[in-house]
Structure formats: C-alpha cells, structure tokens
Design a protein with these regions (language model features):
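Conserved functional hotspot residues at active sites or interaction interfaces
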Residues: 1-59, 63-277
Length: 278
C-alpha cells in the first residue's frame, strides 16, 4: 500500500499525518519532506510487516504548502478474503476539488462490474468529524450505515447493490450513497468472478459541472494478454431521459434505476474495443 506525491513548484512542504499506531513504514521513510518542481516521494506500507499496515494508509492525510499530484493504492491488494490479489492505483483530487460550493454533503452513485460482493465494494473515507454515511437514500430516506470521524472509513458491502442475483454477482447493479459532510470515495471492482482480477479507482462525487462528453478512452481493450485479456467496458451515470451515445450511436444497454435518487439512471456497456467516446 502506498501514497506517492509529486511537486509542481519548488520548495513545497509535504506532510503525511493521521497515521495509526503500529504501522511500520518501508525504509523508515520520514513523514515530512520538502520537494522541488518535478520531484516525487513515496510512503509505503508492507502488509506483511505489521497487521496495522493492511489499512494503515486508508484515511491518512496528505497536506502540502503548494499544489501537488497524488497517486495512491496498492500493488498487491484485495477486498476479498481469498488469496487472489491485483493492482489498484489511481490519481486522486484534493478536498477543495470534491467540495461543492454551497453544499455540505456528498452524493455518489456506484455501478458494479463483474465481481462478487466481497470484491465489488465502495470505500468511503471521512475528511471531517461526524460524517454520517447513508445508503439508498439521504438522511431522511436512506439507511444509516455509520457515523465517521475524520480519517475513518467504511467499506460498504456489495450486497447493497441493486438487482442482486443468487450468486451475488450481477453486473450493472448500482448503489446510491449520501454522506452528511464532504467525503472521499473509492470503488473496488472485479473484471471477472476470479478474485485476482480486481481494481480500485477514485470516484468523484456527483456534481452539476460533470462533463457531458468523454472523448476519448484510448484502446479500451488493452488491459492484458492471453488468459487475462479483457474486452473493454464502461459504466455510465446519467440523468433520467438523457440520450446516451457510445461512439456516436445510442447504447443498447438497458438503463438501471437508482434506488435512493430517481433523477438518475446507470448503464454498464461491455464488449468494447478501440477508442471509445461517450
């Protein structure tokens, strides 16, 4: 598990804080550093070194005196209790970016892929104390899961996704999550029913400024070769009644209603290759 940062300006002070007791940082790397333009720095935890290392960076606070680039994730991680592992890495946005002017809460809609419930799990990380997390509705209509303090997190069970099947795997199901204060979100997904084929990515909150066009996603199928090759797929969240075009043509994927927010619907479009636009 790791967090990497890169400075965009000289003399940038970077601090890593809110780290739990009991962790062992690789190479005893200091948790405070000054970087110049283009320099990078990594804090890493080996889960085999200490039990606290398994989730010791989830909820850690990265702060800097000047703008930085931050990537985080795991090179050998899993949501599953099985032995399968895989990479899960993404670039994240700062708190100021995910905060919405005039709005104290966050809304998220997650769309599941091809994994089972223990792999298909949203991860909510609180940035502020007293952050209540609800599923399938807000603080009036939803189910309260937990009240988090700053730096705490919840990994939401995949059974909360809509349209569950007997096997626990139903690609395209969705989940609406509402947090009483601005919070960060990540999503674990599965490329197949094999627990080793999983991924983790950063999820931005719902925002009226979200772009209507994504052009393009290059060579979407190029994620592996041989026995681990996948056809490309995308998940889409749109307003109800929107015309959804994939590569200029109306998608044949069926929309799924969102339990907890009837103004939106979701799609899972699979079997794609080449460059993709939405």
């Amino acid at each position: 598990n790791f967090v990497s940062v890169m400075a965009t300006e000289n003399n940038t002070q970077v601090d890593f804080s809110d780290l739990p007791p009991g962790i062992i940082i690789e190479n005893n790397t200091p948790t405070s550093v000054v970087l110049n333009y283009g320099e990078s720095y990594v804090i890493a935890l080996n889960p085999a070194a200490a039990p606290a290392n398994r989730d010791g960076l989830v909820g850690a606070l990265v702060s800097a005196t000047k703008p930085i680039v931050v990537n985080c994730g795991s090179s050998n991680g899993s949501n599953s209790t099985g032995n399968g592992r895989d990479f899960g890495i993404d670039q994240i946005a700062p708190f100021e970016t995910i905060s919405i002017d005039g709005q104290s809460y966050s809304e998220y809609i997650f769309v599941r892929a091809n994994g089972y419930d223990d792999i298909e799990r949203p991860l909510i990380v609180a940035h502020l104390d007293n952050t209540a997390v609800y599923v399938n509705g807000d603080d009036t209509t939803g189910t309260l899961l937990v009240n988090l303090s700053a730096g705490e997190y919840i990994s939401i069970d995949g059974t909360y996704f809509s349209n569950q099947s007997v096997s626990g795997s139903n690609p395209g199901g969705n989940m609406y999550v509402w947090t009483s204060k601005t919070a960060f979100a990540y999503q674990g997904i599965g490329g197949s029913s094999n627990e080793a084929n999983q991924e983790l990515f950063f999820v931005p909150p719902m925002n009226c400024k979200t772009p209507k066009t994504i052009n393009n996603i290059p060579l979407i199928q190029n994620t592996g070769t041989g026995s681990v090759a996948f056809l490309g797929g995308i998940t889409i969240v749109s307003e109800v009644g929107a015309s959804v075009l994939v590569n200029g043509a109306a998608t044949t994927a069926l929309p799924q209603t969102v339990n907890g927010n009837p103004n939106f619907e979701t799609y899972l479009v699979s079997g794609l290759s080449g460059n993709v636009s939405v």
